[in-house]
């Protein structure tokens, strides 16, 4: 089976880098303690059962018998302990959030692992799949420099597919794991992850049958209507239920005048999200109303009771805010200039950037678009902080601990870590609310706290929230059982099969 991954990842070190183009490959190789059903309830995987202590301060996992890593080493509780304490807690970009309460892992025997927590962590059971907290082989990493270990790009896991080959600029080949612990699986002999930079060529590969699957909107939204008329192809929006995402603008508050709330709010008012939805996303998604995806409505954490930037007199408001901030128009009609870093993950983001340039010019902000390769873009924004406005789309994970904490907590201003608080937002009141919500076991009380947090963010406007993203997968009709759960392409294709 050939799947398209766009763009090519810089590494397969899934435990240390969280870019969205890594999991479609890495989750074929690495597994987690649990997986999830369509209702997002945890189901057995490397763990067969678990018990949460009455005080919420420990979780005891019984581990599966007969599981071996791709190098032949048996899977034991020592691998769980090493993965959590020596790799994930130290190197995973989101460990300061997901594993903040983890103090240790007890291993009373080879098939029992006990996660010890300083405080209850109600979000943790939603983050134990291979996508978020994968389990690695202790013997591969022990005594080595974790980030320089060769298995970063030749990974060794317990999953249904083994790493085969990486031809840089072309493809990664994964081979069937003949010793996989699920009898008879996987069905496919190989998965080829192809890297095709050009959007038209990606679409052509699917239309001719050269490729069988493209997830995470690797196909341009503009091409989807044509794809739907092709008898070889079909599309689905399933498989993204645990991957809510927002298209946003990150505003560097270290670069005046973006340090002024009025300027950030003016930018938010200046943008017509309905135009982006129509002309860039071709109707897929919905206008974002605030800092959390509307997918969180199903669990009671989302609210639209926040400052509304999508109002009829938005341009008048934007101009008044900019005037009030002491930023008059010059002779050319512009108030000030800024650079916009264009998202490198697809051509639709360039189209969005071109619209943003037009929209902000109306209120006197002169945007210069800057497009670079993915590695340069990420380094410029998250390591060098050499940017004014950035145009990412941000995965919000399975809990507001992902969607809010990582993006807005003061503690998440972490130089060199991607997709965290690079806007330098710092609000002690907000921090206190999120830290309380993170440890609150009562769901209703958490919901009240998150509503307040969203209202504060919408007022402070550290980011501009554009589109509640709807991902789309395109697949060949001869490919079956490719999307079998709410993690979609970020879980293994163990049951996928191709008609001959």
Predicted regions and their residues:
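Ligand/substrate-recognition segments at binding pockets and active sites
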Residues: 3, 168, 297, 323-397, ...
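Extracellular/periplasmic solute-recognition and catalytic clefts
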Residues: 104-105, 164-175, 192-255, 278, ...
